Amino acid sequence: MDASIELNAKAYCKIMLHCLKHLTSDCYGLLLGKKEKNKYIVNDAIPLSHDKIFGPPFKIAISMIKNYFPNEKIIGFYENLIVNQMKEEGAVSNQAHYICEIIGKNNKFESLFFQIYSKDSGEKGKPFLKDEIFFKEFILNDENIFSFVDNKKETNEEFQQMKDYCIHNRQQDIIDFDEHLENPNLDWRNTFVN
């Protein structure tokens, strides 16, 4: 597969902040963007949960995302499993596979999956350190098979600035959809991240 993925700084930062805030929990979220030929452009990320994803809250989140972001498509899913449940390098959880399959069917094109991990992801509660967080990017094709996308990005000033921003404790400000359901006054869109 000759596809590429462009992850903008806002989406990158939201994913990082979500994982940093919930160091001892699994984190899940959705990727918003578009597909242009063989290029996937991820414009935003919506943190969903720092626990398990359940049907009714997930459906409410999807409905609200479609309402607040009418010009964006849900093109993928991200997950950070703190307890290393992966059986082998690059394995994808059943939950991620199922959600990506639904996203792909709804869009009529392949969906993205970002697996977030640190060098020591098996150590529950170990704080993420700068330059120790990694993304593995996959595309679920129409044959229901995940393909790894080697999408090495040169470190540029914008991403370095966002990484530094994440490391300076702004993670306490990120709100996932679970937290919004507990307190509707909280901003699940995380508009403070630009």
Label every model-predicted segment.
Residues M1-I75, N80-N194:
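MPN/JAMM (Mov34/JAB) isopeptidase/deubiquitinase module and associated MPN-bearing subunits/adaptors
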